[in-house]
């Protein structure tokens, strides 16, 4: 149902959007040099762990602030159950640009796969590079680096769709998670991100303010054991996500009834 927005509320939401994105940009812009200075003389493994913890702390404080000021209503507590589960592949649906940040804000030993051009960015990529995040430059490198990180006890975060989805849809899954799971034998923990808004999803302009607060819930799903057939594994995984994220039958019936009523003279 559409929520009516007065001009005053719209202006307020635009201001909230601007300040929220500005705060995130400044945190990422100045956080990397600060982390580089603090960890300059640490051994590689110690530096990586320190930077990951610092990134988790930074994002957690950021989202706590947004929650406090009624920008987001967040329910992320189920993610805390995964702390200490080493060598675990995490898969999640991808409804918005905030998805990876939300998960990282609760799990301090997560490694992500990022666009190579972002990792090469001097302003925004240095912190991610220090954290050991993996560039998506080639499948071979992704699989090899992911296997090494999982063997060392990291948790690997993947979005099987490969890109953000439009609200209410699931994009076709890519095969990377199946290749990594088969190569490493690590279990795959499914994660579901649910929101009442399409904010920063596929096709959502940066300048468009939603009706705040945006409500987001992250919940855990089934944990899968990898199979020998990667394609079959991916097909089963996608089918599971489609089932879990399908709208309730009653909602579908109401929408059908509304369309039928609207078509009557």
Enumerate the predicted regions with their spans.
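Membrane-anchoring hydrophobic helices of lipid-metabolizing enzymes
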Residues: 1-88
């Amino acid at each position: 149902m559409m929520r009516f927005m007065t001009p005053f509320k719209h202006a307020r939401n635009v201001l909230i959007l601007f300040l929220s994105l500005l705060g995130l940009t400044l945190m990422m812009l100045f956080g990397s040099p600060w982390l580089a200075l603090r960890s300059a003389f640490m051994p590689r493994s110690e530096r990586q762990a320190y930077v990951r913890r610092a990134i988790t702390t930074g994002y957690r404080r950021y989202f706590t602030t947004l929650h406090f000021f009624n920008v987001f209503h967040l329910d992320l507590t189920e993610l805390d159950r995964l702390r200490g589960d080493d060598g675990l592949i995490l898969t999640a649906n991808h409804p918005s640009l905030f998805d990876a940040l939300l998960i990282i804000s609760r799990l301090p030993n997560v490694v992500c796969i990022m666009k190579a051009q972002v990792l090469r960015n001097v302003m925004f990529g240095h912190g991610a590079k220090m954290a050991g995040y993996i560039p998506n430059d080639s499948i071979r490198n992704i699989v090899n680096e992911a296997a090494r990180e999982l063997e060392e006890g990291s948790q690997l975060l993947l979005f099987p769709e490969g890109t953000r989805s439009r609200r209410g849809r699931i994009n076709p899954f890519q095969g990377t998670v199946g290749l990594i799971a088969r190569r490493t034998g690590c279990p795959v923990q499914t994660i579901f991100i649910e929101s009442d808004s399409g904010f920063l999803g596929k096709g959502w302009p940066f300048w468009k303010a939603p009706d705040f607060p945006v409500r987001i819930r992250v919940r855990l799903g089934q944990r899968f054991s990898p199979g020998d057939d990667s394609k079959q594994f991916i097909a089963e995984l996608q089918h599971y996500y489609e089932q879990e994220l399908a709208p309730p039958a009653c909602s579908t019936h109401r929408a059908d009834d509304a369309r039928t009523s609207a078509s009557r003279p």
